[in-house]
Amino acid sequence: GLYDETVKVGRRTMVLFFIIDTSGSMRGAKIGQVNAAIEGILPKIKEISKENADAEIKVCVLNFATKAKWVTAAPVSVEDEAYRWEYVEAGGTTALGDACRELNEALSTKTFMKEVGGSYAPVLFLMSDGEPTDDYRSGIEVLKRNNWFKAAIKVAIGIGNDANKSMLAEFTGSDESVIEVH
């Protein structure tokens, strides 16, 4: 009949960015907490994505130590059976400013935010003990001019008892968006 035909409606994309401090100060238990948390949450995110007819959730991972480095070359669907969390290891200095500049490049319709069906505002998870060794403020200032960053949901997760919450709040824009993990 008239209503028997099914038409697949395009899904918009929501990109979750994990920006992970992999510097030497994150060695041991701290980086272990990060790996366990992300590995534990990905199956739940996958389930949410599969159950949502309107949005597909994709993830991007940006590690930063002495320099920032994308682990994922582009957003990866959490529904992709081949995608697995790759444990990160810690070592080096803390180039958060470099990570902010890399993130700024990715938050563009020319790169990571170019889905044909459109994109929801991204979600940014910064995971760090909050002790940058570079000029991170200039990187954050660049990000603050980016429209995707302005629209993004920003959460900073302070790892360890000594996490610098005020620095993490500079990234999110508010103290309320900083969560501590001990």
What are these regions (language model features)?
Residues 56-83:
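Short, charge-patterned binding micro-sites
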Residues 84, 161-182:
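Von Willebrand factor A/integrin I-like adhesion domains
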Residues 27-28, 132-138:
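Extracytoplasmic/secreted cell-surface and envelope-processing proteins
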Residues 69, 81-120, 133-135, 153-166:
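Von Willebrand factor
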